[in-house]
Amino acid sequence: MKKIAIIGAGVIGSAVAYELAQRGWRTCNIDKLPAAGYGSTSNSCAIVRFSYSTYQGVAMSYEGMHYWTDWENYLGGPEIDESGLIEFRQTGTALIKAPDGHHQKVTPLLEELSIPHEHWDLNRLSERLPILDHGVLGPPSRPEDESFWADSTDDIEGALFTPESGYVSDPQLSSHNLQRAAEAC
């Protein structure tokens, strides 16, 4: 049997351990903290979004969403972890169409990968997220600068909504789920 040491026991280290364990490797995660998912990046799996600026980032995040939506089957069943399994809550996310134009980089990638998305104007954004302030604030300034207190004079353009995105109910538990699944292999 092949053996490997994995540095880190967060969601990435635990996922690597699980994937390798399924392939017959004996894994050992090394982490300075007391349990899986306790590190500074434990929440890095919390929000599942597709608004990255590279093809690879968007493609990987969209593929990853499919693991979250089928988490129980991916891990081998509900009994894999005595603490229970996380839930993926598919709420969708809204990327604000801000002056920096990030949405213009993301839109062609979503289209190329056939990822469902919607362009919301300010009316639609107000219907869906009525509490959201549409004002553009910035550029950044210090509190002692007079412009720091100025009201916004411009509005955002709207939002780019991706209905299949969402969040993981308990990021720390997701690492624990992966740890238990790796141990069960």
What are these regions (language model features)?
Residues 33-35, 125, 178:
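Short beta-to-alpha linker loops that shape the active-site pocket of alpha/beta-hydrolase fold enzymes
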Residues 39-45, 149-153:
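Short, flexible, mixed-charge acidic loops at enzyme active sites
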